[in-house]
Amino acid sequence: MKKIEVRDLDLFYGEVQALKKINLDVEPNSVLALIGPSGCGKSTFIRTLNRMNDLIEGVKISGTVLLDGKDIYKEVDVIELRKKVGMVFQKPNPFPMTVYDNVAYGPRIHGIRDKRTLNEIVEKSLKAAALWDEVKDRLHHSALSLSGGQQQRLCIARTLAVEPEVILMDEPTSALDPISTMKIEELIEELKKKYTIIIVTHNMQQAGRVSDYTAFFLNGELVEWGPTDQVFYNPKDKRTEDYITGRFG
C-alpha cells in the first residue's frame, strides 16, 4: 500500500487557485523531493498533508488525500493526523525553553508524565536526530543557546518525539551553513529507514542527493513526478527539463 495517495486535489485561497488537480503517490520509507520555482505550490501542497491549511481563512479544498488508505479530511481526527504527520519548518523554531523541554513538549501534550519515560523519549529522539552527543550535558540549558544547525536538528528531534510516520520538511536547510546542511542531509538518509519523508527544496543538487522520488510543480500544477534519476536525466515534459537545466527558475 502507498503511504500517501493524493487524487484530484484542488486548493483555492479565496478565488485564487493555488493547486490544480494534483495526483501523486508517496511510497513508504522513501524521500520525495518537491521542486519548482517560488510560488509554484510546493509549500501549499505539503500543508494539505497535515491540514495546516485549515488554519488559513478562506481556504477551499476538494479532492482526496489518503494516509494509509484513510481520507485525512473525512476519517482522521486532525490532532491524531498531526501526530502522525510531523513538520519541520524552513527557519529553526525551537521553543524558548530548555533543550529537554523542547523534546518533551509533544509527549507531555499527549499525556505522558512519567519522568523515566520522558527521559527515554528525549534521549532516543535526540539520538535519532544526531544531536545527543552535542547536547547531552546541556539538556537543561536554553534551546536558544544552540547554533542554527543544532536548533534545526532539535526541531527534528521534537518532531520525532511524538513518533510520527511521515515527516514534512519545508526547505529545512535554506537558513543553514554548508556543514549544517550536510548533517541534515545525512540525517534524512538515516531517517527514511523508519519514516516517510517529503522535503520541499529550492536546491536542485540537494533534491538529487537526498531523494528517491522527485515531483516538479509549476503554477500550481504537478507537471511531472517519478524516480529522481528519471525526472532529472530523462524528464518526460519539456518544462521539467527547462527548469532542471536552469532555463528558468
From Swiss-Prot:
Main location: membrane
Record's GO cellular component terms: plasma membrane
Lineage: Bacteria, Bacillati, Bacillota, Clostridia, Thermoanaerobacterales
Purpose of the protein: Part of the ABC transporter complex PstSACB involved in phosphate import. Responsible for energy coupling to the transport system.
Membrane topology qualifier: Peripheral membrane protein
Biological process (GO), any one: phosphate ion transmembrane transport
The encoding gene: pstB2
Organism this protein belongs to: Caldanaerobacter subterraneus subsp. tengcongensis (strain DSM 15242 / JCM 11007 / NBRC 100824 / MB4) (Thermoanaerobacter tengcongensis)
Alphabetized Pfam families for the sequence: ABC_tran
Keyword Cell cycle among UniProt keywords: no
Catalytic activity: phosphate(out) + ATP + H2O = ADP + 2 phosphate(in) + H(+)
Name of this chain's protein: Phosphate import ATP-binding protein PstB 2
Cross-referenced PANTHER family: ABC TRANSPORTER I FAMILY MEMBER 17
